[in-house]
């Protein structure tokens, strides 16, 4: 969070989301640079599973901006949105004749930063 009054930024971070970073980036790329209301509309009507945690995160970032810095939600834009890869959960799938195939369950970390339009 920056202390400059003209360029206040608020960040919300979700870690260890059980989803591939590639699939989450597909959604995050659509809302980067958009206004708060526009991002909510886009996320609500996109048919991807990644939309729900990202929608919660955008709402959390706006709530943080409203509560901590008294910024109006109508004046917020999503200045930065990024998805980083998290740790991979490694499991084994039993197969025929005593074999086991590895299963990789990826996770990701999603960061949303909002700032005032002005």
Curated annotation (Swiss-Prot):
It is found in: Plastid, Chloroplast. PROSITE patterns: RIBOSOMAL_L22. Belongs to the universal ribosomal protein uL22 family. The keyword RNA-binding applies. One of its GO terms (molecular function) is structural constituent of ribosome. PANTHER family: CHLOROPLAST 50S RIBOSOMAL PROTEIN L22-RELATED, LARGE RIBOSOMAL SUBUNIT PROTEIN UL22M. It comes from Physcomitrium patens. The keyword RNA-binding applies. The gene is rpl22. One of its GO terms (biological process) is translation. GO terms for cellular component: chloroplast; large ribosomal subunit. This protein binds specifically to 23S rRNA. Part of the 50S ribosomal subunit. Pfam families: Ribosomal_L22 (PF00237). Keywords: Chloroplast, Plastid, Ribonucleoprotein, Ribosomal protein, RNA-binding, rRNA-binding. This is Large ribosomal subunit protein uL22c. Its main location: plastid.
